[in-house]
């Protein structure tokens, strides 16, 4: 049985792909046979030019494109809108089959989400699928990637509460884009008056 981890973020462009690539590369360099999978990507002309292509190359996985990604959309909008525009909606059985194939090959698999945890994946007359539906279907725990900046506490708490409210375990949080010390070190006016 394969061990899996789902990477989500508090927002889009938060560093999920970068952190995912580092995790997979570190696992592989440490002797763990780790793979990667992403259900849907929007805003990329080809798999090679996408987040999945970056992780595949950076982490030295070198898997065929159909092993790392199920749905590629060229429009740079959320997957549910891109699917409506391009006519190729995400199907849960396709994602489940692809996940099974990846987990049969790799004992450790890191799956990267699209956008944030509440990202809609499909919205049409046949189905309403959110990212959390995929995570629950695959029974994966989540690792949250957040930007180490103003507003982070709220974004992290909101993401964790939303995830847990859907019965999905959260394994941890990684603060990305950290610049310097997170502790406020300048004394307050009150502290400056004390001798």
Per-range role (PLM):
Residues 2-5:
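Extreme N-terminal starter segment of soluble prokaryotic enzymes
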Residues 16:
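Conserved lysine of the Walker
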Residues 19:
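Hydrophobic positions on the alpha1 helix immediately C-terminal to the Walker A/P-loop
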Residues 22-89:
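N-terminal phosphate/diphosphate-binding loop that engages ATP/GTP or pyrophosphate donors
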Residues 79-121:
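Phosphate-binding/switch loop-helix module in NTP-utilizing enzymes
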Residues 127-147:
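Inter-motif core of Ras-like GTPase G domains
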Residues 173-182:
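G-domain G4 guanine-recognition motif of GTPases
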Residues 184-191:
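Conserved small/polar residues in nucleotide/adenosyl-binding loops
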